[in-house]
UniProtKB/Swiss-Prot annotation:
This is Respiratory burst oxidase homolog protein B. It is an enzyme of class 1 (oxidoreductase). Residues 75-84 have a biased composition (Gly residues). Ca(2+) binds at D242, N244, D246, R248, E253. Its main location: membrane. It comes from Oryza sativa subsp. japonica. The chain crosses the membrane at residues 356-376, 441-461, 497-517, 540-560, 569-586, 718-738. PROSITE patterns: EF_HAND_1 (PS00018), EF_HAND_2 (PS50222), FAD_FR (PS51384). The keyword Repeat applies. Its EC number is 1.11.1.-, 1.6.3.-.
Length: 905
């Protein structure tokens, strides 16, 4: 090793030394240039000792030497690791320490030779310190470096310079790009302030004082921003913060970049607490109180990496699953097209067998009824005049009777809730699709109306008017001795006008029930906007009372049927109508008494939390929902909300997000009676009435509650493993599940026990859940306040780690993006020193950007082999196709089964 050091020093100082021993020749491989030049230059040399080969690139100046790059290379000369740009020095971890030790000796030799001529300059000392930092990088931190500080992300960078050049041509003015448009040009939309700071830094480094860029200058900027070397990216980031270019970051400069990063990521609370976080960074990186930090200090903090144990576990899981998936995929590729389509068909039946048999039965009944009535009228005398028009009209009428009766059953909420909670019928009937089935039946009604009314109005009546006297003779028992004089005679008759009115009312209700109108998605300029929305949907849907009344009349006054037992409309409708009316009466009596308000909180993101006393005899399951009516807002409207409390809690709670007129007015009414929170409380406004202060209670409006009602999420009890995914306010039913699991853990000391006595009087069932993964994705940092108490409770009481919480803030750019680099650093530092997350304010660490859902499923699959996992999602529909597909893929390609359930949100 002494020969290695001596050879290196000699190469750095003596250009003329060309004779070496054979041993030295084996150690020093010819370099790329003169290491002893008086001018500044970059030189490269390769060294070999035993089986290790390393290439070192030096930045040589008159009085200092700095390592530019350190790379491990193989015998053929190709590199298998780097040092300067953050890659591992050698691939095998066992060699890392030995090689690092040798490199340190080389560095020390260089410093000693340089100092023999002159005392070490501050620059040389900083270089040596930087070298030691780089040589100490672990393999995991090098991996972090590869991903870190990306100024141009893969989403933008994959398009390359061509895309940037195209945007330049679109945004340029007189051949130059304005400073204010720099961010948009390089793909940093929405981060204009951050992009301007980048512009200023790059321009300052090049001595550019103008506020515009030419295309060549922009390309130069772009090449620096897309440099793949971590140290170069670190220098770019450091220069952006170091505005006076003195090589040091003061507390004020650190504060500015914290505020800038917080603004770019829409994190207002971090921006407000910039002073506090600046002090935290300076305390960590400047322990001697020099008043500044240097680049190598910042680098050390940026390169913090996850624990090696976790990394090894993840790697093992990933490789294990990848092998299984590869084998499965390989077998799929060898399939013939016929076998492939057959397999896809079988997969479809496996996933949708409940829906399939119900839909098959429904369609079969409709077809059978149509054919039965069609054949019946095909053999009657009226067929001789009206032909296939009357058979079509009567066949469609029979399906209409059936569907008008059936369409009421999916909305009998109390009946469905009782059946799914008390019986095993839910094992074969897809109760979760009740609303979807209601819509399908409504579509069947629309088809039946079109065929029935269309055939009568356009074919049957005209044919009867133009029938010969001989043909009409057979119709006299039905239409009278005198032939109808005109078309109007049919329309103004009882059968005619009742049918026309029903068609008009159903058309109105059907149109305003469409999502586009029900959710009021019309533009403000559209004159129909005031006529749409939930209220329009709710009131027009209640026109069914008139429709069913007219249907009874229409089905009684028939032209071609005189005997009562042949008028079958009432037979179809009797039971469903009685059942539905009974439900409405039950709801009326059950929701008569108001609930007591115990606590109110108004949170960021326009969320109102209401904590109420339980109505007498009120029992529910986690995942269910209730209807709420506030008479101060509207005396008629009921709105559904998921229950966020657990069955074992002594209160009933809901979290309501403002989305329309009714919820906006409700929030306003309760906000007026609240106060600002005291220290230690969350929310914007609060009111705690649990101590029974009657004068304060009187200020709150009266609330009526109806429910509970069954929902897909209540089926979580069927699974040992849960994957709960909530998007925004969609986390509400899942929070109740998390609290219920926690209550079982707290009450019994472990899972696998029976459910609380208060939740049901039925026979107790074992509590199945052994593991729960909860992923909550939200755009706003303030959203974490909604359920801060629950997260703290889980952290404190779940000692066995049954519940795994993952919070994701999607407004923050993904880890590795330069815009979020400082936020990630702050989070790691805050969590390490204080155990508190900077966004949620709890011990639950927040992740940035959206989750990689494939990786999430991968983790669960390898952790729970040969088990059924219940995947429960509640949120906007945008994520449903992806999660459904992933559930199917991992079910088919691993030995873990994923059952996907979606809330009707």
């Amino acid at each position: 090793m002494a020969d290695l050091e001596a050879g290196m020093v000699a190469a750095a100082t003596d250009q003329g030394n060309s004779t070496r021993s054979q041993d030295d020749a084996a150690t020093l491989i010819p370099n790329s240039g003169n290491l002893g030049s008086s001018n500044r230059s970059t030189k490269t040399a390769r060294f070999k000792d035993d089986d290790e080969l390393v290439e070192i690139t030096l930045d040589v100046q008159r009085d200092s030497v700095a390592i530019q790059e350190v790379r491990g290379v193989d015998e053929g000369g190709s590199g298998h690791g780097t040092g300067f740009d953050g890659l591992p020095l050698v691939s095998p971890s066992s060699k890392s320490g030995k090689l690092t030790s040798k490199l340190r000796q080389v560095t020390n030799g260089l410093k000693m030779k340089s100092s023999s001529r002159k005392a070490p300059s501050p620059q040389a000392q900083q270089s040596a310190k930087r070298v030691r930092k780089r040589l100490d990088r672990t393999k995991s931190s090098a991996a972090v470096a590869l991903k870190g500080l990306q100024f141009v992300t893969a989403k933008v960078g994959n398009d390359g310079w061509a895309a940037v050049e195209k945007r330049f041509n679109q945004l340029q003015v007189d051949g130059v790009l304005l400073r204010s448009r720099f961010g948009k040009c390089i793909g940093m939309d929405g981060s204009d302030e951050f992009a301007v700071q980048m512009f200023d830094s790059l321009a300052r480094k090049r001595g550019i004082v103008k506020q515009v860029l030419t295309k060549d200058e922009l390309k130069d900027f772009y090449e620096q921003l897309t440099d793949q070397g971590f140290d170069n990216r670190l220098r770019t980031f450091f220069d952006m913060v170091d505005k006076n270019a003195d090589g040091r970051l003061t507390a004020e400069e650190v504060k500015e970049i914290i505020a800038l990063s917080a603004s770019a990521n829409k994190l207002s609370k971090i921006k407000e607490r910039a002073d506090e976080y600046t002090a935290l960074i300076m305390e960590e990186l400047d322990p001697t109180n020099l008043g500044y930090i240097e680049m190598e200090d910042l680098e050390a903090l940026l390169l913090q990496s996850p624990s090696e144990a976790a990394a090894r576990s993840t790697t093992t899981h990933s490789s294990k699953l990848s092998k299984a998936l590869s084998m499965k995929l390989a077998s799929n590729k060898e399939m013939s097209p016929v076998r492939h389509y057959w397999q896809q068909f079988m997969y479809f039946l496996e996933e949708n067998w409940k829906r399939s048999w119900v839909m098959t039965l429904w369609i079969s009944i409709c077809i059978a009824l149509f054919i039965w009535k069609f054949i019946q009228y095909r053999n009657r005398a009226v067929f001789g005049i009206m032909g296939y028009c009357v058979t079509t009209a009567k066949g469609a009428a029979e399906t209409l009777k059936f569907n008008m009766a059936l369409v009421l059953l999916p909305v009998c909420r109390n009946t469905i809730t009782w059946i799914r909670s008390k019986t095993q019928v839910g094992a074969v009937v897809p109760f979760n699709d009740n609303i979807n089935f209601h819509k399908v039946i409504a579509a069947g009604v629309a088809v039946g109306v079109a065929l029935h009314a269309g055939a009568h109005l356009t074919c049957d009546f005209p044919r009867l008017l133009h029938a010969s006297d001989a043909q009409y003779e057979l119709m006299k028992p039905f239409f009278g001795e005198k032939r109808p004089p005109n078309y109007w005679w049919f329309v103004k008759g009882t059968e005619g006008w009742t049918g026309v009115v029903m068609v008009v009312l159903m058309a109105i209700a059907f149109t305003l029930a469409q999502p586009w109108f029900r959710r009021n998605k019309l533009k403000d300029s559209n004159p129909l906007k005031k006529m749409t929305g939930f209220n329009a949907f709710w009131f027009t849907h209640h026109l069914f009372v008139i429709v069913y009344t007219l249907l009874f009349v229409h089905g009684t006054c028939l032209y071609l049927s005189r005997k009562w037992y042949k008028k079958t409309t009432w037979m179809y409708l009797a039971v469903p109508v009685v059942l539905y009316v009974s439900e409405r009466i039950l709801r009326l009596f059950r929701s008569h008494d108001a609930v007591g308000i115990q606590k109110v909180a108004v949170y960021p993101g326009n969320v109102l939390a209401l904590y109420m006393s339980k109505p007498p005899g009120f029992r529910y399951r986690s995942g269910q929902y209730i209807f709420i009516k506030c008479t101060a807002v509207s005396p008629y409207e009921w709105h559904p909300f998921s229950i966020t409390s657990a069955p074992g809690d002594d209160y009933l709670s809901v979290h309501i997000r403002t989305r329309g007129d009714w919820t906006s007015r409700l929030r306003t009414v309760f906000s007026e009676a609240c106060r600002p929170p005291t220290e230690g409380e969350s929310g914007l406004l609060r009111a705690d009435l649990s101590k029974g202060i009657t004068d304060e209670k009187a200020r709150f409006p009266k609330l009526l509650v109806d429910g509970p009602y069954g929902a897909p999420a209540q089926d979580y009890r069927e699974y040992d493993v849960l994957l709960l995914i909530g998007l925004g306010i969609g986390a509400t039913p899942l929070i109740s599940i998390v609290k219920d699991v926690l209550n079982h853990i707290q009450g019994e000391g472990s899972v696998g026990t029976t459910e609380p006595e208060s939740s049901s009087k039925a026979k107790k069932k074992p509590f199945m859940t052994k593991r729960a993964y909860f992923y909550w994705v939200t755009r706003e940092e303030g959203s974490f306040e909604w359920f801060r108490g629950v997260m703290n409770e889980v952290s404190e009481k779940d000692k066995d780690g049954v519940i795994e919480l993952h919070n994701h803030c999607s407004s923050v750019y993904q880890e590795g993006d330069a815009r979020s680099a400082l936020i990630v650093m702050l989070q790691e530092l805050q969590h390490a020193k204080k155990g508190v997350d900077i966004l949620s304010g709890t011990s639950v660490k927040t992740h940035f950007a959206r989750p990689n859902w494939r990786s999430v499923f991968k983790k669960v699959a390898v952790s729970h082999e040969n088990q059924r996992v219940g995947v429960f999602y509640c949120g906007e529909p945008v994520l449903v196709p992806q999660l459904r597909q992933l559930s199917a893929d991992f079910t088919h390609k691993t030995n873990t089964r994923f059952d996907f359930h979606k809330e009707n949100f």
